[in-house]
Amino acid sequence: MAPRAQIQGPLTFGDVAVAFTRIEWRHLDAAQRALYRDVMLENYGNLVSVGLLSSKPKLITQLEQGAEPWTEVREAPSGTHAVEDYWFETKMSALKQSTSEASVLGERTKSVMMEKGLDWEGRSSTEKNYKCKECGKVFKYNSSFISHQRNHTSEKPHKCKECGIAFMNSSSLLNHHKVHAGKQPYRCIECGKFLKKHSTFINHQRIHSREKPHKCIECGKTFRKNSILLSHQRIHTGQKPYKCNDCGKAFAQNAALTRHERIHSGEKPFKCNKCGRAFRDNSTVLEHQKIHTGEKPYQCNECGKAFRKSSTLISHQRMHTGEKPYHCSKCGKSFRYSSSFAGHQKTHSGNKPYQCRDCGKAFTKSSTLTGHQRIHTGEKPYHCKKCGKAFRHSSGLVEHQRLHTGEKPYKCNECGKAFPRSSALKQHKKIHNKERAMKCS
């Protein structure tokens, strides 16, 4: 394509678009047309994201509506078949050099914007970073900052014209267009989800069938995907390849490292839409939301008590069985809960990586730090539904609720007397200890 004169005025979509005539368009096969669509939509999205377009070009409207986007307006001199063939081949060359997410046309957009004193994201070189007021995360580019904020607001401004599904960012919409373009041919009949690869489709179907063909030879636990099995096996081998740059703590899974790093950054991107409380990971906010719904699907067969999480039920059942499966190799002490065991091990190492920014006090566990920080903020997020009393810790609420229910789960083995709190049972046992001491004397 003939070189264009350097653009002096505002950048327009026409400066970075490629136009095909009707004859040229008919020479394109389905894959080439789909590629053209992706490239044009991405270039349009780039210009919109930096505020260089105020109206939607006709070409984009045609693409979104599924119409043929050819035009009779010519950029090239005409007159011979050789010239026309040259122009068509030049246009095709630009498209063939494209990839799914970054195209040669996009590079032209980038170079023109840089000539205007802007970087690829539309910032001048003297502009400052962008900080999110919700979670404190800092972004180099304004477009990344705007896209991130939608995690907090749940805004989905990018809507598919064909099926109506909306997305938070233009890249997700572009990826979704592949469904309609036939680039994601595997459709799940259970939930309607489209998948690009056959292997991904097979793994996805196991969610519905609950098939778990990959078995751990150490403990017998089964998994849907081989990658999850390999990650699980690190529990047995002790391998922890993912290390935190801030405190040096290592993890078996990359996802666990990502969650841990949010402790240092303070980022809590997952927000409860009921009370506004923010969390570091999605699974925690889902569990938290059961507080509002009152859902407790996991019930103890021994006492009938119900729980929001299956893991809490398993831990609770150890009160009935007396099982303490976590043993400290340093001192021989045993624990009912893995969290208690992990916290205990830090007493031997003396490591307290979680420090309060307000008073400097350090803790062995992040959960203890979170609870401690409520002393400074005055936050009491756990409310009793019976009387409205609020507590800093969930354990305080649980103990308080026993006043209303009359539950006394802590029983003395010597006299059978029961108590609502473990501390009350410990205090009571001193009576028996004193009685035994008096008998001995």
Curated annotation (Swiss-Prot):
Superkingdom of this protein's organism: Eukaryota
Protein family according to the UniProt entry: Belongs to the krueppel C2H2-type zinc-finger protein family.
Cited Pfam families: KRAB (PF01352), zf-C2H2 (PF00096)
Organism annotation: Homo sapiens (Human)
UniProt-listed Gene3D superfamilies: 6.10.140.140, Classic Zinc Finger
Predominant location category: nucleus
Function: May be involved in transcriptional regulation.
This protein's name: Zinc finger protein 485
Keywords attached to this entry: DNA-binding, Metal-binding, Nucleus, Repeat, Transcription, Transcription regulation, Zinc, Zinc-finger
Protein localization: Nucleus
Zn finger residue spans: C2H2-type: 130-152, 158-180, 186-208, 214-236, 242-264, 270-292, 298-320, 326-348, 354-376, 382-404, 410-432
GO BP terms, alphabetized: regulation of transcription by RNA polymerase II
Gene Ontology cellular component annotations, sorted alphabetically: nucleus
Sample GO molecular function, one term: RNA polymerase II cis-regulatory region sequence-specific DNA binding
KRAB domain sequence ranges: 11-82
